[in-house]
Amino acid sequence: MTWPFAVILLGGYLLGSVPFGILVGRMFYGVDPRTVGSGNIGTANSMRAFGRTGAVLVLLGDAFKGAAPTFVALRFLPDPWMAAAVGLATIVGHNWSVFLRFRGGKGVATTLGVVIVLSLPAAVAFGAVWLLTAAVTRYSSLASILASVAVPVAMFLLRSPMPYVVYGIVALALVVWRHESNIRRLAAGTELKIGTKKAT
């Protein structure tokens, strides 16, 4: 492991660890999203806690966490495997934040931020699948899982470099893992829908 790679990898994890959902809530709304709705710090629960504007701020912040270190890795590191690893490090940081005692979100927006840098067409596929699924089902969790499935599929069909396809597969696995409780609630019919503030 070269020192530039180590520095960028660690920087990616640390930036990924910044909890934008909590920062936006406390700075602008006086609300901790962990006390609202699903208790998650990501975009969907931020919509419940702060409304649309706050949710957009969280989305942009969380996507930036993935995009910025990945862009730096592509620019300054020689191997695409390194860029893919840095992208994954940002997701790990978001999901298991050093600033939140290794707890965190589910990594969906951060995954998207990385994909925007690695493959813009795959990011478009992610967004299209998310929007379609959310519009039809009103389940953000299901939309996030299916959108994450679209990433490695799109990258494979577009013949993206193998490290990017592997990134997409690992990122999908992380998204599914972090949505384990959502999947159980979807199966039980108790999952929160978009716009719902608390479970019924």
Region annotations inferred by a language model:
Residues 47-51, 73-76, 93, 108-137, ...:
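Interfacial segments of multi-pass membrane proteins
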Residues 21-24, 93-103, 130-137, 180-184:
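C-terminal ends of transmembrane helices
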Residues 31-43, 99-112, 139-147:
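Short, non-helical or kinked segments that cap or interrupt transmembrane helices
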Residues 22-53, 182-200:
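Cytosolic, membrane-interface loops and tails of multi-pass inner-membrane proteins
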Residues 4, 8, 53-99, 118-122, ...:
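Nucleotide and nucleotide-moiety/phosphate-recognizing core
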Residues 1-28:
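N-terminal signal-anchor transmembrane alpha helix
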Residues 12-15, 90-94, 130, 134, ...:
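Alpha-helical transmembrane segments of multi-pass membrane proteins
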